Amino acid sequence: MASYKDIVVDATSGTDVGAVDNFSFNHTVGSGNEGILIFIYSSRGAIAVSGVTFNGVALTSGYVTGKFDNFLSEFWYLLKPATGTHSIAVTLSTTDNNRHCAGAVSFFNVEQTDPFKVTDEQSGTASSFSNSFNSTLDGQYAIDGQSSSSDVAGTVVAGQTLIKARTSTESCGMSYKSLGTSGAETVGWTGFSSSLPYMDGVVVIQPAEEVGAAAILLTL
């Protein structure tokens, strides 16, 4: 029976900027094995991310939600990112009219093949929400990104860790959560200014498998 490592949370970062078509911010990656850097972009409008780099290396687009009232979230990733402090540089398809925020989180001991094991989205009109999905393996982590018409960014529910939140005419935020035992899970936000349109996206990563003595012998 396979055994798995414990995912290690490395670092978070984030930014919110004005009406631009490109921007950058720094993220610091520590030392560890089987690393992943995840970039999250939440926005409203006819905007898409054209490209993202970290230390000049391109990230891969892993999941983009649908649009609800023009709200969306995007998730990009880079496997084995360089250690140290480097720039995350983002290029947008067109100028974002001050309606976005971006965050990043890095982990170690993460499965490197097809890293987003579960993807999910939920949209609606509410002053708070709980997005339900199913995890598929013990020890997974969920990363979510949301944006809404609220002029208050809202608060993550218990068990989630905030990565970045932005309060403006359209607010947004992102977080991560350790999922524990596989099965039914939720992520959520509360405290929006009133019942307003929102979109929330989720991706799930899973721990890397331990390489035991038997597996090592098979490779000899």
Predicted regions mapped to residue ranges:
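Primarily extracytoplasmic/secreted proteins
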Residues: M1-L220
